[in-house]
Amino acid sequence: MIEVVDLLYKNPHDIVRTPDQEASMKHLLLEEVINGATVNPQLQRDIYDLISVPEPDPENIMWRRDILDDFLSNPALFDDLRSILGIYDEICKGMRNATRGGGSAVVSKKELTGRDSQIFKMRSYADCIVRTIEMYEEAAKVFKPRRLMSEAFCRIKDFVNRELRKDETVKLKKLAAELAESITLDTSFIISMDLNKYFCVEDVEMLELDSNPYNYKDPKKREGFDPKARIEYIGFDSIDDGQLRLLVEKSIARLCRQMEHIVNELKRPFEKISRGIYFYRFGIGLENKIRELGLPVCLPSVDAEDKRCFECSSACDLWLAMNMKKNDRYCVPGDSIVANDIYLGPTDGSLVITGKNNAGKTVFLRTIGIIQVLAQAGLPVPAETCYISPVHGLYAYFTAMDTGNGRFEDEVKSISSMLDIVSEGDLVLLNEAFQSTAYEEAADVLCNVLAYAAASGFRCVSVTHLPGIKEHMRELEGEFRLPFRAKFAEAAVDSEGKPTHKIDFLRG
């Protein structure tokens, strides 16, 4: 059995989408971020479909991250691998042509049709076998000089070399090459037993032959018939015995099926590679885009043991940088965007951010959301360092101030829908929620959400103008002995009271 390595999943699983998750990605402007990193419409759709649902398995995240690291550390690797996949595409095209050129070779002993078609198929399949083994040889050349660290590429490199070292592979290529080069529509014999023996699918139906290939006996009537007997070839002339012609036609058809099977098996690993390569095309482009914007960039680190961790140094809002570049193509957003350090440890509860308008609170919140999405996909993030814990659910609600409409009742309904499905370790982002009603009522609702988060084990990061939240939360934490204490931060201002766009974490 040939090993198949999936470039996207070390541990494949089903993806579950929810309406709340989809709505959250719209609030985070994820689609705009993806579209800002690539102009390819199909790639935009494929990436959004993949990363809009957070990948919960840490092994899958690091699987992708390490593969991408290999691509980034070996700049020519991606193009070389694309060239190999070009051979794979040619093989697939050859298989399709062979299938379209084929037909039923056997209709009856009285009437034979499709011989030319079957010979064409046999020659096409033989050529595909040769090309497939050549694809393995090219892959070995690509991988040999490179220092690849990811488990995925190490496994691919090993199985490619393992297959090429087999004597059977060398013999198979030689036989298939002879068949592909020699057979024509006028061919009067075919090699059969060697290929049949190698494939070990089932014995081709053979008649007992002597030195004259047209003297034969019916094997069903011959005593002591050995179906495993080695026969190099069988032959026929177009004007000769119809029964022998039928035998050869059936042998060709069976041989075609065997060759089709072996090509499909040999190319199967490269089919998986072909299906997953798009992700790394985007990842390489995203890293280049972040650098082009003048932002810091790194690959994320993920620890399966730690939960509720979000640690970034010099984190930036990628959407803001892309939007600035869109409005002024000559600007370098990294020169003016203020980076923030973010630390939320395993024992920290929810985070509440307060401060003046237009002081960077919403930017800070969106930075957390976008970095969590990208990091959890194994993609580069706009930060100097990044260490996260994966979440099963990432939910976001940005109200009228930033994204559209939102009355108090609608806000309560939308956020309640999220809270109905949120689970331990999840992340909920709220921007200016519950601002459309009286301060006291809104503050009570928000504090209840934060208390519920502490009791349930998920984290809520909330931007708010509501007064008295810290005092109210300390009362609830003491009264109900909540296992996590909320943290508080505020948008900093300078000595003149102007926003610095830095977010300062408060003590106490």
Regions found by a protein language model. Name each.
Residues 57-58, 67-70, 293-299, 306-308, ...:
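Alpha-helix capping and helix-coil boundary motifs
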Residues 51-71, 193-228, 242, 307-309, ...:
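Charged, low-complexity, helix/coiled-coil-prone segments
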Residues 103-144, 148-321:
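Conserved P-loop NTPase architecture
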Residues 20, 24-25, 29, 34, ...:
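Poly-acidic low-complexity segments
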Residues 311-508:
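ATPase nucleotide-binding head domains, primarily ABC-like/P-loop NTPase cores
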Residues 65, 106, 143, 147-150, ...:
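Residue-level signal for alpha-helical context at structural boundaries
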Residues 1-196:
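Conserved amphipathic alpha-helical "coupling/scaffold" segments
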Residues 1, 5, 161-165, 181-184, ...:
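Generic preference for hydrophobic/aromatic residues in regular secondary structure cores
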